[in-house]
Amino acid sequence: RGLGDVYKRQNFNEVFFTDVRVPDSQRLGKIGDGWRVSLTTLMNERLAIGERPPPAFEEIFQLAKEIELEGGMAIEDGGVREKLADWYVDGRGVTLTRFRSLTALSRGQDPGPENSIGKAITGKMRQDIASFGMDLMDISGAVFDMDNAPMRAMFQDALLSAPSGRIAGGSDEILRNIIAERVLGLPQDVRVDKGIPFSELVKKEKA
C-alpha cells in the first residue's frame, strides 16, 4: 500500500505479510546468523543511499555561479562561499569513507558501521543544499516546473524528496546511535534482550 508524499508520489509503501513461510532452501547464511545477514543488507543499502545524490556540491556550486544577488554574483558572496566550502569538505569526507568501504568489500570483508556515517551526512546535506539553493533563487525558488525553474527544478524536487532519504535505510537518530556505539565505542543502550536469539524470545513470549 503506497504512502504518498506532499507531491503525491509514492516512494514508500506498507507491505503486509500474512501466513508467510520461507523454505530453508531460500535461507541466507547459517541458522542463528540472521542478524548478521540483516546488518549486511542494511549496510549495503546505506552505502548505496549515501552516494551523494544530486543536488550535491557540484550542483549548488554551478547555481551559485549563475545566480545574481544585489551585490554581484552569488559565488562572490562571502557567506555563500563559506557554505560551499563546508559542503565541499563534507562531500570529500563521505567520498573517501565510501572508498574505504568499497576496498573492504573488494577484500571479502563484511560492510562495517562506517557506511552509516555517509548516509547520516549526505541525507542532511542534500536537504540543506536544496533549501539553500531555493533561497538563492529568491521567488524563482517557488516555481516547481522543470521547463521554467532554474536547473530544471532540481532543488525544489530534492527539498520534497530529501526527508524520505533520511528515513530509508535507518533514520538519522538510529545512524547516530550506531556511530556512537560501533564506531566511537561509547556505552550501549541497556537492553534486557541483548544476546538472546529471536527464536528464544518468541518461545518466552508464547510460554
Please provide the spans of the model-predicted regions.
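Short helix/loop capping segments that flank catalytic or ligand/cofactor-binding pockets
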Residues: 1, 24-27, 50
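Short, small-residue-biased leader/transition segments that mark boundaries at the very start
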Residues: 2-7
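Short alpha-helix boundary/capping segments
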Residues: 8-9, 30, 48-52
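A generic structural signal for well-ordered coil/turn residues at beta-strand boundaries
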Residues: 9-16, 31, 36, 161
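Long, acidic (Asp/Glu-rich), low-complexity accessory segments flanking structured domains
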Residues: 20-34
